[in-house]
From Swiss-Prot:
Taxonomic lineage from the root: Eukaryota, Fungi, Dikarya, Basidiomycota, Agaricomycotina
Record note on disruption phenotype: Causes higher susceptibility to itraconazole (ITC) and rhodamine 6G (R-6G). Causes further increase in susceptibility toward fluconazole and itraconazole, when AFR1 and MDR1 are also deleted.
Segments passing through the bilayer: 147-167, 223-243, 296-316, 321-341, 408-428, 436-456, 838-858, 882-902, 952-972, 981-999, 1072-1092, 1099-1119
Organism: Cryptococcus neoformans var. grubii serotype A (strain H99 / ATCC 208821 / CBS 10515 / FGSC 9487) (Filobasidiella neoformans var. grubii)
SMART domains (UniProt xref): AAA
PANTHER family on file: ATP-DEPENDENT PERMEASE MDL1, MITOCHONDRIAL, ATP-DEPENDENT TRANSLOCASE ABCB1-LIKE
Name of the featured protein: ABC multidrug transporter MDR1
Gene: MDR1
Amino acid sequence: MSASPGLTAAAAGPDHLQARRDEKVIDSEKDALAHDAHAVNSGIPYPTATAPNVGAPTVPISVGRVSSAAEGKISRSSIAASSDTLRNSPLEKPISNAFSKSHPYKKSKFDFLKSRKKKEEEERKNKEKEKEASVLPPVSFFALFRFAAPLEIIAMVLGLVLAVAAGSCQPLMTLIFGRLTTSFTNYAVIANQISQGGLTPETSAALQAAKDDLKTQSGHNALYLMAIGIGMFLATWLYMFIWNVTGELNSKRIRERYLAAVLRQEIAYFDDLGAGEVATRIQTDCHLVQEGTSEKVALVFQYAGTFVCGFVLAFVRSPRLAGALVSILPVIMLCGGIMMTAMAKYGTAALDHIAKAGSLAEEVIGSIRTVQAFGKEKILGDKFADHIEQSKIVGRKGSIFEGFGLSIMFFVIYAAYALAFFYGGILVSNGQADSGIVINVFMSILIGSFSMAMLAPELAAVTKARGAAAKLFATIDRVPAIDSASEEGFKPDGLRGEISFENVKFHYPSRPSIPILKGFTTTFEAGKTFALVGASGSGKSTVVSLIERFYDPVSGVVKLDGRDIRSLNLNWLRQQIGLVSQEPTLFGTTVRGNVEHGLIGSRYENASLEEKFELVKKACVDANAHNFIMKLPQGYDTMVGERGMLLSGGQKQRVAIARAIVSDPRILLLDEATSALDTQSEGIVQDALDKASRGRTTITIAHRLSTIRDADRIYVMGGGEVLEQGSHNDLLANENGPYAQLVNNQKLAQEAAAEALQVDDDIEDPDDAVFIGGSSPMQEKDKQLHRAVTGRSLASIAMDDIQAKRAEEVAGEDKIPSSFGLYARLLRMNSADKFIYIIAFIAAICAGMVYPSLAILFGKALSDFEIQDPAELRHALSRSALWYFITALAAAFVIFFQSAGFSRAGWDLNGVLRKKLFTATLRHDIEWFDEERNSTGAVTSNLADQPQKVQGLFGPTLGTVVQSCATLIGGCIIGLCYGPLLALIGIACIPILVSGGYIRLKVVVLKDQRMKKLHAASAHLASEAAGAVKTVASLTREKDVRRIYSEALKAPMKLNFRTSIKSQCLFAASQGLTFCIIALVFYIGALWIIDAKYSTASFYTVLNSIVFASIQAGNVFTFVPDASKANSSAASIFRSIDNEPAINAESNEGKVLDHKHVVGHVRIEGVHFRYPTRPGVRVLRNLTIDVPAGTYVALVGPSGCGKSTTIQMLERFYDPLAGRVTLDGIDIKELNLASYRSQISLVSQEPTLYAGTIRFNILLGANKPIEEVTQDEIDAACKDANIYDFIVSLPDGFDTEVGGKGSQLSGGQKQRIAIARALIRNPKVLLLDEATSALDSQSEKVVQEALDKAAKGRTTIAIAHRLSSIQHSDRIYYFSEGRVAEHGTHQELLAKKGGYYELVQMQNLSRQ
């Protein structure tokens, strides 16, 4: 742009812009290229100075650091000398090389793609190796409870004792089995002897005595079984309740400590840790830890108690037989240890990949407007899917180990049965044992080993908890280099506020090869105001970060009042500083709450609510925020939304300023504090800041030089050093100096106004809009007619419809479809694994039939004990042992396929659900994301948590459920075949168990629904804090965040406590009733044996079948919590997937535009709009704007007047309540949305970049597939955005990682990359929402010229507070309260001397 003092009065269309630009574009580009190349690549300052007259030659200067004695005084001879030196130095080479033919980026498309793919493959392999090397080993079991209170430990120990007691009940049952077996065998022997010898009075009496004895023994043993059942009920109820409650408490403490640990870390830690990863860890990993430290631990001890008690009882009854069988234990332990170690290793690695995906998801969802504007949902979805694919691959490997481990374990267990009968037959034939002892030992081993089948999934949960806890505890135990939680450090009683830098050198830890500050030395005297100006990336914001001690210098010292700030208490230091950042962050609370955050750590922190409110109001008045706050629906108690999204940029900035000054800090740091304000607000707020600066040390970073010209000293920075310093007037005295050049670039002179154009004078009601091109008479007539009939506006009716629809959606969320429908759909969704599921289902059914098969073998073996001949007895039992061995082989085979198959399918389903849910989330319209329940934290939390819960049921757990059902059905069938009447009695009791389990399912489902919402809300708090960690740190809000988060966790804990009493009672009842059913079958069976209705073999076959069936009926409902969580999570996922947004970018409907035929004529006709989340606030009021094709139109006005909303309407983020938006005369609602948005490029006020390379971020703007974009196209876009030379100066060039949210780049660098991203798609319509707000003056000038050039041949609509950037627009619209108050060219509006004229007056730098 011209540096002339005045502005031309002619309308400045694109042709004029181009003609004006052609004069200086070559020199300007050279200036910028030289500036970036030397400031970043070489580190030597290379500012440019251009004389005021147009076309003057560019003169490079090298000033270096200037002493305070020579402030602003630089001789022209030194400039010339340094100029000659630089021209002849090798430092010119990077610039010339950037355009040489041999430049590495000047390759053919084929070579470029080939080399890029090769490099990406190498990087991927290296990252995989690094990931494998960085996988943390699982923590020990006891470490999971490191945060438990002593009373909780006592309760847990009591619970474990009760769990072991409950586990011993089943082995005790085998003791009764053994005694009854002895009685049955003796009775059978007597009955056989009598039948062979004939019935005599003596034998008849003996037979009757045997019957009476058997009947008595059966009655007593049935009572014993019922007593065991009651004991089982009480013990199970108590231990399940204790461990459920303590598990929730333990999880709560881990969540609290993890968040506390995250918030205490130094800022450099967050270069690799995104807020999404924090949310994922808190939801997924903490959920896994909770699963593995609650009732599942008690179940492991119960099943282990059953196992141990069974073996101990076996040793007591027959040491020889038990000793032979105990040989299986080492094999079981070895297999189990290997399996669990492998599962923990691969499980931890898989969770790391999922956490990375969660971090990406948080970035993407937090910038959903940018994603949808560029239509890159698929590309970012694919990147998310890549992380998930890696987790699937790792999870599949773990599945193989799990399958092998379990198959070998069960083979050993079942093979032990064969050993038991083979060796037992020898002992009985030798008279060393009787049948009762053998059966007692056999049943003890059988029940004990049977418990191992149930222990596996519970133990797997504990193993996963150990793996998940590794990463959590690593963060909790990490001692940061800069610890905000430390109480160490000196706390001075008083503070003057003098800040000094002594030879400070600094580079960011993630980019050690790029120096930021190079021996920076200066002193900021107490009570004075200082300003830092200079190019983007010159180190200005780094100075602020070092003062706040976000980082420590690599060398050198930063001092406060002569004391090294590293020796000061960190919280005390930050509490003395008020900071307003370039991109202000507000928290999801009220306006009042946000401002009160500034009182933390001050003397007002514990003041009364009334006193605090008065301080808040005073600060808001000083920050020019009070008036707009009072216009909000609830005033100071209005919720600002996530990250303050319900406020405009300027409104957020003013609230942030109020927050910074409310505590009256001694030091004030303003990093572009007024960058987002309109000129009118800026002037008022700047006056307030000037007033607030009096008596305190103030350091201001500014690109708008109008805000710092009254500073006591101004520092011009470049290349990490001070180029010159002095007061505003002193620096201007050096006409060729860097500061003078910056000022010249920002001059906005006033010329004599021509005859003022009349603004429409026929406005009677200020709330009625009078705009260019208003509604047609017919439209007005229709509106009046409709209002006459309804008494309400079209906008009000439309808003009512929206509100009703939202209420209906919320009400529908509590409805959960049938489980069968959900499960069927989940299986269909994972259809790629249908053969795996089929094989795994068949294998699980076969594994479930093993136990009924054992019942048949058991009955046959028991009848063999009635054989009196020892040799024949050994032969018969050997044959039974052989059948057991064959069954063991078959069981091992099917268990491998069951376990490995379901585990793999579970990981695959997890991946499918995560990808589909993420894709569906990105498809939602912006209105959906505006709702509080769909905040970034909540959505990211659901994305991390819900698929994990579905996998919890559809992994190995589903195999166990299928196996249990097969055992239940198979046992009933076997029982009916061998003894229908007795089996029917037992089967008739099973529905009692089932109904109890069903009631429990309902109770737990309702609990899980409510728990999900409560945990999602708390996860949002954690994600919000992690996403704004610099703001949290600067406000010393760490304790406050922890307190709020802890309060949020109390609600789910209380809910869990109440519901656990009911649900665990029902589970315990199902366990206790099993023994009562067995007692009933036992007693009735004994009576029927006495009556000769059943043989001993038939009785035991039926009994064991029913025993196994009833046990499995009870065990099926062990998985009720898993099923409940899976149900509610699956329902929620499907609701999201099935949701059809009103504005759907994936829809194929609508007219598809041909890019070649799109002209770019944009028109807004009579638009009314209110945000659905704030229906009481009118944002746009009958707005009508016409933008002819190829014109450059600017929108200006106060913050909150509707400018950004207009841009959002053009992007079709929302649909108007009334009126319409058209492109080339076609209502955009009739156009295909993806096709329409492909014609538009958006550059937002706060640029959004994603974790990845610079190349990746620029390519996100391309309309065509990424692989089809040539390097020449990328280069051209970057050159137009004045970022090319900076990129090629980096060690990795376009492949440089930008960090999460672009954290590795300065604000100006991010903005220029965002502009390159917008230009690479060659749009027909260019939307610029404060596109140059984050740029320094030099960069702004060149980028603005690039944007002017880019505007050639396309429609451009720009929002700007810096009027210097839009003064040559074809038309300028001045907004006020959602309507156009003035319109015209720059000179026409100046002539009107209205609102626009006042803005120009405020920005005029020519009046010194």
